[in-house]
Amino acid sequence: MISLKIWIDISNAPHVRFFKDVIKYLESEGEDLIITARDFGDIHKLMNMYDIDFISVGKHGVSLYDKLKESTSRVYELVDVINNEKVDVALSKHSIELPRIAFGLGIPSLYVLDNEHALAANKLTLPLCNRIITPNKIDIWKLMQFGADPNSIIPYNGTSELMHFKSFEYNDNIFDDLDLKLKYPKTILMRPEPSLASYLDADCHKSVLSPIVDVLKEYANILILPRFKAQAEIFEGIDNVTILEPPVDTSSLMKKADLVIGAGGTMNREAAILQTPVISCYPGKTLAVDQYYIDQGLMFRSNDIDEIIQKALAFIVNPHEKIDF
């Protein structure tokens, strides 16, 4: 049997969990993989945690200037890595650089997409992709506006987070394993917003979660899973607030927690899949993949701080009653 040479590029931490079982499967089938990953957030820690061999190429930029400069530099570096590899197919999830390099080198590319509001990323990538795999809740016309070929789009029922749990084994002792000092009977896991992302205009030294934490810390244990150091510093020194240091078993944490409040996307959808009550306070436009879980009554969404606090407190008092969506 002739094996395929497959290039997978990982540019964000959640993509590690998405691809880990894909990588394992392809390797078990005897395919030849080359995996690249940029140095951003917890990507490298997660890659090592899941024992994935990879080549580190490039890093993340904060300002528009830095984003453009770092992405351009990463393309330049990746071209030299990939050019002599004789790659048969390239695979990524929201990587900016892979579709551009694959197109330039004549490599067929497969692109996984779940954010129809990522304006810059979608404009730069979708016109260049041979196949685009996307949830069927995303309006194809929106992708076509970015230049996607409608004949290249492969829709599916669900969201990409389902892949995160293919080999998931729940650890009921996760709180003890992390030696958490829990003061109250109820525990809330929180995830701040992706304030460094190009699709969100946010201050990385502030968080929409701060006023929520200030109130709820008097009623429940608060666990914060920050995305980067400056975000962790926002919550340092606050009584009854534990800042988790990645990498940790976030899936078990979500399942063990009584409530999840997230200002991002991935963890909220993961919590919905695990059927842990979840409140989304994502400060951007509602994504179709979030609406998918909202419509099923598995996620509550609000940007009203008082409403979020009220819903959370009501749930803490009456945990057996479903959050009123």
Give the location of each predicted region:
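Donor nucleotide-activated moiety binding/catalytic core segment of transferases
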Residues: 74-81, 229-267
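Catalytic donor nucleotide-activated moiety binding site of glycosyltransferases and closely related
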Residues: 50-62, 190-192, 213-244
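Catalytic binding pocket for nucleotide-activated donors in carbohydrate/polymer assembly enzymes
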Residues: 273-320
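Short acidic-hydrophobic, aromatic-tinged amphipathic segments that line or gate anion-handling sites
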Residues: 55-56, 154, 242-246, 299-308
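Active-site and donor-binding regions of nucleotide-sugar-utilizing enzymes
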Residues: 9-17, 25, 39-48, 53-147
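A nucleotide-sugar donor-handling region in carbohydrate enzymes
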Residues: 133-204
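Short internal beta-strands
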Residues: 33-39, 223-227
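A donor-sugar binding/catalytic signature common to diverse glycosyltransferases
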Residues: 90-101, 111, 253-290
